[in-house]
Amino acid sequence: RHEFNAENIKPRDLYETYLPPFEALVKEGKVKEVMCAYNRFEGDPCCGSDRLLMQILRDEWGFDGIVLSDCGAIADFYRDYGHKTHPDAESASAAAVLSGTDLECGSSYEALVEAVKQGKIDEKAVDVAVKRLLTARFALGEMDEPEKVSWTGIPFSVVASAGHDSLALDMARKSMTLLMNKDNTLPLKRGGLTIAVMGPNANDSVMQWGNYNGMPPHTVTILDGIRKALGSDDRLIYEPVSYTHLRAHE
């Protein structure tokens, strides 16, 4: 993902296969922040792609919010194990901002001061990104007293309500796509099943949260979820050892 170049994508495939989910989120969901990806698109890193971030996202779809890079994506522009499309952090940061990436998850944008001094980007272009960022922070109420911001007082009981749990479950179910069902394997026949569950993460609740997350009131592990779904005459075999990890160190 840090070196891959998605290229020679036909316009019809782009607009009918890849873009519709994102377009719906922008136009119908009214999202205020979009994250640009690690990989390249037709030779340009996604976070430095005028085609994606300016022409399509902002001009065609009318997006006026913030574009944030995935973590370390700007450094991929110039580091050896990345795309190597730019010689240094100054060039990479300037290109990203000029292409519409307002905020970086990382430290490459620290080079923007030097990039301005070197003439690689005008200070007015940086101001455009800063204005978008400050507009969002004001809209979130970050500059107001907490008691004046309506959503700072929402209790956890509302956030983790039964209605929200039900909605999250429904969204998860509808997000799944079955690409192939060889030999009609699914749905699994109930009764007399033997299920093997492999790896330590199957029984690790914290792993499921991700690395920037809220604190859920409870977590059902993958292993517990499978156990709950099985019948009394089904058999479950759980092996917590990570065989991939072992092979990597042999």
Task: Describe each region flagged by the PLM.
Residues 1-247:
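Glycoside hydrolase catalytic-domain context in secreted enzymes
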